[in-house]
Design a protein with these regions (language model features):
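Short, glycine/serine-rich, charged loops/turns that create anion-binding
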Residues: 6, 33-35, 95, 114, ...
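Secondary-structure boundary/capping motif
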Residues: 10-11, 38, 99, 117, ...
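Structured adenosyl-cofactor binding patch, chiefly the S-adenosyl-L-methionine
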Residues: 119-166
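Glycine- and other small-residue-rich loops at beta-strand/loop junctions that grip anionic moieties
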Residues: 3-4, 114, 138, 142
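A short acidic, often aromatic-flanked loop/helix-cap motif at beta-alpha or helix-coil junctions
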Residues: 73-79, 96-98, 139-140
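RNA substrate-binding interface of SAM-dependent RNA methyltransferases
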Residues: 1-89
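Active-site/ligand-binding-proximal alpha/beta "capping" segment
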Residues: 82-122, 130-133
């Protein structure tokens, strides 16, 4: 999961639910519109809070693995190391419905910040093989979109760790 740096409480909730659903990675991304959010979740102390929430969610859900939580990254870092076998999705209301997408593991899902991706960011993601997919016509909060997208991908691929990168 490539989640936007956003409101602290929403990020913690998102981390918890993505862990319950079996995400293997949960990477906070500083998108252009992430800069305006306050108080936002970022930094090493916040990352420790995320990991603690994830450990609790792992126990509650009887999960098998704890997601990796790397340091906050920029769009340049997101695009720097593409994996050739990775299915890359970006949530965008103009995309085709995610449920119609042909998926193959591993899958990485980019979630936009409050206010959405800027056109330049979306263009760069598309150029980097991120396929635009939609969760429908409604504009969702980032944490709702992350959980909905991950649940659909997990259901489509099955529940093993090798089938959902997150």
């Amino acid at each position: 999961m490539l989640v936007p740096i956003g409101d602290k409480d929403r990020m913690l909730w998102c981390a918890e639910k993505c862990t319950e659903l079996g995400a293997t990675s949960w990477t906070p991304v500083l998108w252009n519109r992430s800069r305006s959010v306050s108080p936002r979740g970022d930094g090493s102390a916040f990352r420790e809070r995320v990991r603690a929430r994830m450990r609790s969610a792992l126990v509650q859900s009887h999960g098998a693995w704890l997601p990796d939580v790397p340091d906050d990254v920029s769009i340049d870092q997101v695009l720097a190391n593409p994996s050739p076998e990775e299915t890359r999705l970006v949530l965008d209301v103009s995309g085709q419905p995610i449920a119609r997408e042909r998926l193959a593991a591993p899958v990485t899902i980019a979630i936009g910040p409050e206010g959405g991706f800027e056109a330049e960011e979306l263009g760069r993601l598309r150029d980097a093989r991120f396929r635009p997919v939609s969760l429908g016509a409604n504009v969702l909060r980032f944490e709702t979109a992350a959980v909905a997208a991950l649940a659909i991908v997990r259901a489509a691929l099955g529940a093993s760790p090798e089938n959902a990168h997150g």
